[in-house]
Amino acid sequence: MLQGMSQGIMQVVVIGYVWPEPNSSAAGQNMLALINQFLSYGHNVTFMTAATDSIHKTDLDNIGVSSEAVALNCSSFNERIEKLSPNVVIFDRYMTEEQFSWRVKDACPSAIRILNTEDLHSLRQARHDAVKAHDNALRASKETAASPVVAHIANAAKEADYNTPLAQREIAAILRCDLTLVISRTEYALLTDYYHVPAKQLYYHPLNLSLIHI
C-alpha cells in the first residue's frame, strides 16, 4: 500500500509520541526512515508532537519537514489538523493513536489513518513479564537455568500472556486504523493468527536503514 502512495503529491501528517532521535534509538531511526520514504515520493510532510523539546532530536527543517507542537486534550488540535487537511495521518505507537485518532477522524474523515507500531509493545511486555516470572520461580526453588541464556529466555517467553489489558489496548488501536506497519514477521503472524487481525489492515515494513539520512 505504501508503494501505491507514490503517485501524486499528498499531505502527510506524522503525530509522534516523541521527537525523532535517530542517534538515540531504533524507534527514532525507524521514524526518520518512514518520513524519508514519504519525502522520496514527493509528498509534503508535517511532524506534530505533544512531547517536550529535545536537544537530541533530528533537524526536521533541514530535510524539508515542517514541525509543530500540539497540546493534548485540546480542541486546538482539531482546528489545526482540519486546516492542514492531510491525505494521510501516521500515529507513532498505539498511545498516540489513542490520544489523537478520534480527533483526526472527526476533523478529517477521509484521511487514511496509519499506525506505526515501532514494535508490539504488548508482546515485548508479555515476554519481559514471562522471563521475570520464570526467573523468580527458579530463585524460589533455589535452582538455576540449565539451558544457555538465549534458550532460557525463549523457553520462558513461550509462557507469555498475550491477553493482557495492554494487548487489548494495542489491538484496539490496530483495528481502528486503516493500516498498521509491522516491523517483524513474528509480530505479523501473531496479529493475524492469534488476534485475527485482517491481513488487509497490516503491512510488513521492516526497518530500512538505507532511508535514514541524519
Task: Please describe what each predicted stretch is.
Residues 55-76:
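Conserved nucleotide-sugar phosphate-binding/catalytic loop shared by glycosyltransferases and other
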Residues 108-125, 133-152:
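Active-site proximal beta-strand in glycosyltransferases
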Residues 176-182, 188-209:
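Helix-loop-beta element that forms the nucleotide-linked donor phosphate-binding surface
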